[in-house]
């Protein structure tokens, strides 16, 4: 079992149950999935960009990403319907907890000028989204072998009913929010 999953079950869930005054341990908010998305606008001119992004995301997550396609044509962006414009991965269960553990313990401290995560990036339903400017903060990516610096979006979907519950859950996981 993933280290963070054990910590959640044995320490975080009972603590949150008390803190949020819940009657049943199953009511305690939990992380259900983590979605990583890489939007690749530069893929329009060069199809190799998609292959490199797929390889990077596969190294980061240990799971094969899905290529996303444009749903409709947008002349302003020079995009046609059906063209590949990004890659995404959805992590669940043990892989999700292992990724979250690596993100908090290894990757976020490697971000340049890191002052903490924005505590206001919740969506109103307890889900949290954040952006990473460079994929090189992940130790799985070799700096010498990348073709370009690419950012990615990370979304944590939770069972929390409100932003306050979601914030309490992520604080219990020791997310480094700035004040």
Curated annotation (Swiss-Prot):
A GO molecular function held by the record: rRNA binding
Domain of life: Bacteria
Pfam families on file: Ribosomal_L5, Ribosomal_L5_C
InterPro entries: Ribosomal_uL5, Ribosomal_uL5_bac-type, Ribosomal_uL5_C, Ribosomal_uL5_CS, Ribosomal_uL5_dom_sf, Ribosomal_uL5_N
Keyword Nucleus: no
Any single GO BP term: translation
Keyword annotations of the record: Ribonucleoprotein, Ribosomal protein, RNA-binding, rRNA-binding, tRNA-binding
Cellular-component GO terms for this entry: ribonucleoprotein complex; ribosome
Family (UniProt): Belongs to the universal ribosomal protein uL5 family.
Role of this protein: This is one of the proteins that bind and probably mediate the attachment of the 5S RNA into the large ribosomal subunit, where it forms part of the central protuberance. In the 70S ribosome it contacts protein S13 of the 30S subunit (bridge B1b), connecting the 2 subunits; this bridge is implicated in subunit movement. Contacts the P site tRNA; the 5S rRNA and some of its associated proteins might help stabilize positioning of ribosome-bound tRNAs.
Complex formation: Part of the 50S ribosomal subunit; part of the 5S rRNA/L5/L18/L25 subcomplex. Contacts the 5S rRNA and the P site tRNA. Forms a bridge to the 30S subunit in the 70S ribosome.
Protein name stated in the entry: Large ribosomal subunit protein uL5
Organism for this UniProt entry: Pseudomonas entomophila (strain L48)
The gene coding this protein: rplE
């Amino acid at each position: 079992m993933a280290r963070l999953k054990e910590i959640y079950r044995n320490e975080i869930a009972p603590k949150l149950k008390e803190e949020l005054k819940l009657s049943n341990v199953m009511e305690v908010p939990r992380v259900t999935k983590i979605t990583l998305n890489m939007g690749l606008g530069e893929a329009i001119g060069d199809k190799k960009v998609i292959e490199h992004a797929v390889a990077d995301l596969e190294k980061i997550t240990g799971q094969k990403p899905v290529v996303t396609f444009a749903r409709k044509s947008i002349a302003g962006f020079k995009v046609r319907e059906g063209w590949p414009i990004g890659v995404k991965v959805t992590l669940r269960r043990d892989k999700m907890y292992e990724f979250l553990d690596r993100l908090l313990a290894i990757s976020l401290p490697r971000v340049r000028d890191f002052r903490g995560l924005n505590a206001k990036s919740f969506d109103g339903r307890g889900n949290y989204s954040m952006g990473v400017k460079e994929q090189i903060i992940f130790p799985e990516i070799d700096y010498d072998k990348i073709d370009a610096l690419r950012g990615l979006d990370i979304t944590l979907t939770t069972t929390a009913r409100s932003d306050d519950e979601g914030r309490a859950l992520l604080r219990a996981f020791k997310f480094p929010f700035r004040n």
